Amino acid sequence: MTSLSVLSCKLLFKLAITSHCELYSFFPLVCYTIFDFEDHDLSNWTLNGTAFSNQPTYGDNPSERLKNDPTRKEPSKHQGHWWIGTYENRSSPSHPAGEKQDDEPQGSMTSPGFLIDANFLTFLIGAGCQNFETRAELIVDGDVVFETNAERHHHSCMETMFEKKWNVSGFTGRQAQLRLIDHSSGDWGHINFDHLQACHKLP
């Protein structure tokens, strides 16, 4: 790195500089993404059963399969292009939009480990809300410390995802995993999930 480059880093950012001009701010990002499925790759995840075999899902598949039902306007509201939806069967852009695998398949998917280094985890969740047979879990050092389904204030299930959060400030510095569960084949027996973030404070 030239002396001019180093000087530029110092003047523009007033931050510590490594040999690669890697910058460490005194004001870190409020939130950063842990898992968003945009790499379309679950090879590092542990899959059990068949519910997650066709995942992740591409695009707003619920809107396409519900387009002829005027009583249900339930866009997925996912982030980016890819997300998890165990009712859906669209695992590539070339696959016909609107295809589904229904509620019958069951299974789980467990993430690789990650370090908790923020106060909150936020995520998008939707679909199954009637019981905890479909849920998201946070596992810390092998124990389930949080679990949630897609229950809303009005107690009705929807494909549309909305944000929930876990306060993980008591687990800072510990290793964690995310586990998604679909153990239901009944009505609303599926889970939608996307965009797990770590947040130092809530935006």
Label each PLM-derived region with a short phrase.
Residues 84-120, 162-165:
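Short beta-strands within extracellular/lumenal beta-sheet-rich domains
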Residues 105, 184-201:
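Extracellular carbohydrate recognition
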Residues 122, 131-138, 191:
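Beta-strand acidic-aromatic groove motif in beta-rich domains, primarily in extracellular
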